[in-house]
Amino acid sequence: MKASDTGSAGVLAGKLSALLSYLRSFLPFMWKNFMQDRVLLSAGSLAFQTLLSLIPLMAVVLSVLSVSPVFETFKRYVDDFLFQNFVPASGSMIREYFWEFIGNTATVPTVGGIFLLIIALFLISTIDHTINQIWDVRAPRKILQGFTLYWTVLTLGPIIIGSGLVASSYVWYTVFTEGPFLELRTRILSYLPLVNSFLAFFLLYMLVPNHRVRFLHAVSGAFLATWLFELSKQWFSFYVKTFATFEHIYGALSVIPLLFFWIYLIWVVALSGAEFVYCLGAVRQEVKKERKEFSTLHGLWDVLAVMEQIWKGQQCGQYVRYKKHALSGKGIDAARVRSIVAVLKENRLIHVTEDGEFALHCDIHEVTLFDLYSILPPEILVGSDAAVSGKRFEQLYELEAAVAACLRESLDKPLALYIKQEEGLPE
């Protein structure tokens, strides 16, 4: 084998090993965040509110689009495009009820129209709050900023989306349904819903969080969400056609639970993609493998830093939430903070309030360093000690030196004294 081939194989093996190491860190981190943020419960809440707000929201959107006479011309094409590509099953039944409900909103008086607008705004606000909760953004948007965002979504959003759908539908019915190479062009156009889904998820992850999101992270999350969305469509269609449970139980009313279930799946996909984007930016990017200098109290300082921040927040009435603490906890990475918090909770040194915030569950004037040190598992004591900095911890360094000296004096004895030797063997 050539030296170049050997070198390439070594580089490939190194990259594969680094990838596996990253996945071992990333996947558990994402799963814990997924469970902590109660994504499935949040998706159910959003699905219920979406079901209630869907008709008011679409009524507002269509009223904006109806300002342009062009939309009326292509309304049927847009209708076909939407229900053929984004509603996987029972589309005809849903379409019939959908446009009937939309038509009923035209007779709503002015006060009722304002109420519909408020319901639509509440849905957008809930989506904004849920996505920002994943990033643990607790600072609310400024009133003017929030109003501008929501109003833009309700006005410019429909215009942009509507124009795109009109163009897509026009191309579908005038260019791709006749002429040569029909099969090839139809196959190319079949990817258009994927592009639309990708753009929708990308904008959701890039613009909605009131937090800096890296472009590549948003793109990666959009790819994942689009792929999950397509899988959900296939699975949902298979389920409805194979196991007609809802239709058997509810009959003509089955459209309601079916629509709710489909909206629920969409929100599970969207929030899962948001968790993925968040975790890409929050998880530890690399595992430091270099050998560190021996330290008797290694890892203890990170634990003290976590408890200190919780105690300070408790004193000033600004309780600490996990993710906020994980990202601002003096440089300690999120996975390590999670482990520390779990140990402190298990030993009843801290507890979680009803609002999901942390508070000390012990008297720091009575609990000693030895009490704390004795409960820490090995994985905590081999941490990075990223929190050690500044003059505040000088006394801890002095304590560590004293403990190391005492330990060295006690252990400064040959191994032969403690290794059992058989009789007759030379000592």
UniProtKB/Swiss-Prot annotation:
It is a multi-pass membrane protein. One of its GO terms (cellular component) is plasma membrane. The chain crosses the membrane at residues 51-71, 107-127, 147-167, 188-208, 218-238, 251-271. Keywords: Cell inner membrane, Cell membrane, Membrane, Transmembrane, Transmembrane helix. It is found in: Cell inner membrane. It comes from the Bacteria. Belongs to the UPF0761 family. This is UPF0761 membrane protein Cphamn1_1013. It comes from Chlorobium phaeobacteroides (strain BS1).
